[in-house]
């Protein structure tokens, strides 16, 4: 509930909708998001893996906005944005929602730096080859934007304001965004 509360607050979301979470009892790793649901396979939660469990839940839930509603006009060149920005928001809400301590957030940023160093192409040319470098490099771009937005507005706006602007300029996701929409939402 804290994850959902933190993400809906970030998005300024007040609508009440049905969203299903499917947790099959399969010892595997990963999740897949759909418009009104996601499935998540992971080993049973323990104290040791609780931050990883919570992060994947937060990541897949945020795809409700940044994938199911907000979609790029070109799928392949926007994967870094959809996955990386979603990963950053997941990391952020663990801290802001008091699901995990700030040290977990800082650890995630450190791991993103390590993973992003393995990137062998530009983000927009990575295509559909998902993996840690894509998620992490995109998350670092999101982190940079969040810091820049907060600094430019003396803390009055953040990455959530950017996403709310992007929803607005795409008519709540009815229209797929172009890079000009991203720029417009960032500068609004």
Where are each of the predicted segments found?
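Amphipathic alpha-helical substructures
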Residues: 103, 124, 131-139, 143-188
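Extracytoplasmic/secreted envelope proteins and their assembly/folding machinery
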Residues: 4, 58, 83, 87-90, ...
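Secondary-structure capping and boundary motifs in well-ordered enzyme cores
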Residues: 49-57, 78-85, 127-137, 171-174
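Long, well-ordered core segments of solenoidal/helical folds
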Residues: 61-62, 66, 108-121, 163-171
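Juxtacatalytic substrate-recognition/specificity segment
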Residues: 1-78
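Post-HExxH zinc-binding segment in Zn-dependent metallohydrolases
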Residues: 43-45, 76-121
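Sec-exported extracytoplasmic/periplasmic mature domains
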Residues: 5-12, 66, 70, 90-98, ...
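Active-site-adjacent structural elements in folded domains
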Residues: 24-26, 48-51, 73, 122-131, ...
